Amino acid sequence: MDSRRLQLQHATDLAEEQKGGVLVITEGVFGMKGDLGKLDEIVALKKDFQFRLLVDDAHGFGTMGEGGRGTASHFGVTDGVDVLFNTFAKSMAGIGAFVCGPRWLVNLLRYNMRSQLYAKSLPMPMVMGALKRLELIRNHPEYQQKLWEIVRALQNGLKENGFEIGVTNSPVTPVFMKGGIPEATNLIVDLRENHGIFCSIVIYPVIPKGELILRVIPTADHTL
């Protein structure tokens, strides 16, 4: 908290010098290691500093918080988030993304954002599919409950068997290992061909040489 306070004080001083404002950007769930952004602590700093908060909650939407509303809901600070970015590509298994915020901001982005101006609209089948998946997330909390049963079983099982999974607090389950590209290739082939497990693996240069992260993300459709 102290380091964030110092950073915000520095940003505030710079903003005053430049006659601008401060925008704090963070993730709800960090997609590589599964740990959560300290949204409750960041929102609490609004009492002492003037800033807007943008949260990229690509991995939290649909999995975290009441009814899958996301990481801000998980921390109980939804009203403290000014701009929320989410994607249809994770929990909703589609394509596209969306931004939530004040109407004036949404309209500003709609008519000025290059990626919006020079891109085609989503195909109607994808839009209808996204609406249906959103309906399922809203009306079937048992899917989220089942997901978390599987997440806890997977993560507890990995830890009990001596695997290092770090400090994840989300369905994103990293398994930290040592090795290079040959070991990574052999591992993912063995998992897929001999155990029926398909998952991605992270290697250098995304992480330091000699380290591997087996990135396992369970779904509500998996079985125990």
Locations of regions flagged by a protein language model:
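Conserved core segment of the aminotransferase class I/II
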Residues: 83-85, 92-144
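Short, small-residue-enriched loops and turns at beta-alpha junctions
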Residues: 5-6, 29-33, 60-63, 116-117, ...
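Active-site phosphate-binding strand-loop segment of PLP-dependent enzymes
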Residues: 2-54, 219
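Conserved PLP-binding catalytic core of the aspartate aminotransferase-like
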Residues: 140, 144-155, 159-195, 204-211, ...
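Conserved active-site segment immediately N-terminal to the catalytic lysine
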Residues: 50, 70-88, 107-111
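Short beta-strand
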Residues: 22, 85, 119-120, 164-169
